[in-house]
């Protein structure tokens, strides 16, 4: 069993990483995105830059990156990577943590605090921040806003960024399909069929599974929250009780991985490398490298080359695969 698991860890190291490099913010336009923010959607370039020494960067986080794994953690790793790449000081990074993305007032307050503290560009990292970010972008045209996931933008001072995560999702499905013995694979999903980000990942994962194991079935449990430790734990527990012997996830905590390890079955992590959390269960993880985009976006504000275009990078831009 250890030899088989080692093989799949090597496979994971080779292929399961969504690492998006940035030759420029406008280098990776979403083929399907439309400007659906508030106001005029004509794409324009920023007229002047901001000095590297004076720029301030705000980031709105859904949870606390100190948790050490998962969605917010990997975004903050990206922010720290950008900070190092550009030589910014700690005082130039303004973080707002544990901002509930379903609470528009809390979102607005966090963004306004970043503006009041002098931020030139603000990254709002969760889907639910979208509409409030769009509104704030119209109210503060001299500040740049970049929303992670979602679909709204205005082609001026407000864009959206994401990546083709369906690509490594497909590859992780291959790993799952080759490892299941019961032909039951569990998927803990943050949102249901109304959310294209989640359903696109499930579809890609399923296609990967079926490419190597057409007899396998995938069971999905929805938590209806991007971050809900109790709900994620309950969903994973239900899937394990259904005799699923591989568990994967599109949610923020490591509970699905930890429960899989407790049940002595396999798991596939998401967002960050979750093998450190469940080393005996986690075959591989679908990992984001956000620092590439964050570096390019902030650099464009410094240089005065921001043009409001959307970003949708893919695995063809990987400089190096890692888990």
Task: Please name every model-derived segment.
Residues 8, 25-27:
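Short, aromatic- and cysteine-enriched interfacial helices/patches
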Residues 11-12, 209:
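Prokaryotic Sec-type signal peptides and long signal-anchor helices
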Residues 2-11:
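Bacterial N-terminal signal peptides that target proteins for export
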Residues 27-322:
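A residue-level marker of the well-folded mature domains of exported/periplasmic proteins
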Residues 18-22:
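C-terminal motif of bacterial Sec signal peptides marking the signal peptidase cleavage site
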Residues 1-2, 24:
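N-terminal hydrophobic targeting signals that begin at the initiator methionine
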